[in-house]
UniProtKB/Swiss-Prot annotation:
<keyword id="KW-1133">Transmembrane helix</keyword>
<feature type="topological domain" description="Periplasmic">
    <location>
        <begin position="1"/>
        <end position="7"/>
    </location>
</feature>
<keyword id="KW-0653">Protein transport</keyword>
<dbReference type="GO" id="GO:0043952">
    <property type="term" value="P:protein transport by the Sec complex"/>
</dbReference>
<feature type="topological domain" description="Periplasmic">
    <location>
        <begin position="71"/>
        <end position="100"/>
    </location>
</feature>
<dbReference type="GO" id="GO:0009306">
    <property type="term" value="P:protein secretion"/>
</dbReference>
<dbReference type="GO" id="GO:0005886">
    <property type="term" value="C:plasma membrane"/>
</dbReference>
<feature type="region of interest" description="Disordered">
    <location>
        <begin position="77"/>
        <end position="100"/>
    </location>
</feature>
<feature type="transmembrane region" description="Helical; Name=1">
    <location>
        <begin position="8"/>
        <end position="32"/>
    </location>
</feature>
<keyword id="KW-0811">Translocation</keyword>
<feature type="compositionally biased region" description="Polar residues">
    <location>
        <begin position="83"/>
        <end position="100"/>
    </location>
</feature>
<keyword id="KW-0813">Transport</keyword>
<keyword id="KW-0472">Membrane</keyword>
<comment type="subunit">
    <text>Component of the Sec protein translocase complex. Heterotrimer consisting of SecY, SecE and SecG subunits. The heterotrimers can form oligomers, although 1 heterotrimer is thought to be able to translocate proteins. Interacts with SecDF, and other proteins may be involved. The channel interacts with SecA via subunit SecY.</text>
</comment>
<feature type="transmembrane region" description="Helical; Name=2">
    <location>
        <begin position="49"/>
        <end position="70"/>
    </location>
</feature>
<dbReference type="GO" id="GO:0015450">
    <property type="term" value="F:protein-transporting ATPase activity"/>
</dbReference>
<dbReference type="InterPro" id="IPR004692">
    <property type="entry name" value="SecG"/>
</dbReference>
Length: 100
């Protein structure tokens, strides 16, 4: 289950990158910092394309999968827990003589 979600996560990440790069630019650097605000406020409302909507959905799915992958452990227990259990089982199996 974990590896299937991880594979899906990587595929969505690649498709999200591609869909982001395929989108049309909305201006140069000045527009990113508010330089093109007059055009966006007074101009015709921007029509969201299918690519824009797909990018939104892919981004949301990417975030949900990231949260799922952080919650779902790929194995039960951690390395530290396994080493503690191993040490405890070895300690029970051997008898220690009292220090004489």
């Amino acid at each position: 289950m974990y590896y299937a979600l991880l594979t899906l996560f990587v595929i969505i990440a690649v498709v999200l990158i591609i869909s982001t790069l395929l989108q049309k630019g909305r201006g140069d650097v000045g527009a990113a910092f508010g330089g093109g605000m007059g055009q966006s406020i007074f101009g015709v409302g921007g029509v969201e394309t299918i690519l824009t909507k797909a990018t939104y959905w892919l981004g949301a799915l990417f975030l949900v999968l990231a949260l799922l992958l952080s919650v779902i452990p790929k194995e039960k227990g951690s390395v530290v827990e396994k080493s503690v259990q191993t040490e405890q089982s070895e300690g029970k199996g051997t008898t220690q003589e009292s220090g004489k």
